[in-house]
Every structure is written in C-alpha cells, then in structure tokens.
Amino acid sequence: MKFVIGPDVAMWLAEQRAQVPAQHKLLAPTLLRSQVLAWCYREVQAGRLARKEADARLNYLRALKIRLLGDRVLQHSAWSLAEQLGWPDTFVAEYLALTTLQAHAFVTRDEQLAQEIGLLVRVVPPEDLLR
C-alpha cells in the first residue's frame, strides 16, 4: 500500500527506528524535509533532545525510503483543498492533496486532523505502517 506520512509520523518512526515492511510505500511532499529539520532544531534548542539524537533521527529519515513529491499538480491541488477547507495555509493541504492523488491512506497521530479530513481521505494510525 501507498501511505502519505506527515512530520508527526516521520518523527515517530525515527524515534522508534521503526522497520517499515517493504510492501508499504511511503510518500510525502518535499516540504517534509524542512519540517523534520525544523522540528529537530526546535527540540534541541528547547533542551528536550540531544543534538546527537537529533542527528540520528535525521539520518534515519534520510535513509528511510520516502518518495518526496512537489510538482505543480500537487501544488495546485493543495491550493484548491486549502481554499475549500478554509485553511490559513497550504502546508497540511499538500499532504492531503498527495493522498488524494497518489496514495491509499494518510497516516497521522493528530486525532483532530484525522477527524477533519476523514471524510475526504482514508486516515490510519501510524501502527498500520508496521504491519
């Protein structure tokens, strides 16, 4: 199956050094790279994560097979979805758009987001990636 993962799930996978079964294909918008880098930086600056651990998590994510996409069709779709949903920006909409265009489900740990988009796309918990 093809799953779109957001930064919350990427960091969850990295924290656990999880082994995603080969039959699962992971996808994300290209902005995922910047989001996980910013997340690690914030955690280190706040003293909640050691720099060495942040580097280990980033290295894990760099090695994880995630197909990163960011073409104009995705951007156009994200714009339309953000507008339709009344969102203030297109960041989350890129994940939603990618799910509608290329994946079977969106994976998130955010229950509020899952409820909000659950009528538009299939949403699954991160544990589904490990099965």
Regions found by a protein language model. Give the residues of each.
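Phosphate- and divalent-cation-binding pockets in alpha/beta enzyme and binding domains
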Residues: 12-13, 35, 77, 115-116
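Short, flexible helix/strand-to-coil boundary loops that buttress conserved ligand/catalytic motifs
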Residues: 14-15, 40, 117-118
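Acidic, PIN/NYN-like endoribonuclease modules and their adjacent C-terminal/linker elements
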Residues: 29, 33, 96-131
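Short active-site oxyanion
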Residues: 1-2, 23-26, 66, 100-105
